């Protein structure tokens, strides 16, 4: 649980995630890393799935065919960056989660308004 999983050959497509489901068995094409206790898992997920990080880590890609270019686990782990204090990671990740939940709620409301609009337009032109 909270492990990071990525596909070395598909990192360019953002194939990286945090396991939020519990004990699972992943395909052998995925590499799995355990997150250090000094890093908040949700923050690490946000960091690793960010397009800026993926762009920077792709500098380590190796291979001769575009479809087969891959970032090795060793190169992935060699990437160094500074992390904020754990408390700041928690605040940041929780704030982003609340924003995400708000967006989902507003999207659901918008869908309802669009359905209502469609119904009213159909009723007008019977």
Where are these regions (language model features)?
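Positions in alpha-helical segments
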Residues: 28-31, 42-43, 77-78, 94, ...
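Low-complexity, flexible helical/coil segments
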Residues: 39-48, 66-72, 81, 115-120
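Amphipathic alpha-helical coiled-coil/heptad-repeat segments
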Residues: 82-126
């Amino acid at each position: 649980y909270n492990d990071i999983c990525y596909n070395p050959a598909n990192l360019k497509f953002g194939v990286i995630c945090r396991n939020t489901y519990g004990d699972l068995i992943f395909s052998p094409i995925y590499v799995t890393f355990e997150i250090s206790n000094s890093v908040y898992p949700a923050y690490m997920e946000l960091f690793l799935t960010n397009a800026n990080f993926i762009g920077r880590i792709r500098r380590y890609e190796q291979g001769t065919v575009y479809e087969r270019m891959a970032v090795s686990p060793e190169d992935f782990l060699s990437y160094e960056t500074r992390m904020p204090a754990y408390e700041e990671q928690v605040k940041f990740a929780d704030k982003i989660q609340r924003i995400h939940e708000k967006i989902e709620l507003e999207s659901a409301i918008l869908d309802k308004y669009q359905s209502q609009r469609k119904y009213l337009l159909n009723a007008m032109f019977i």
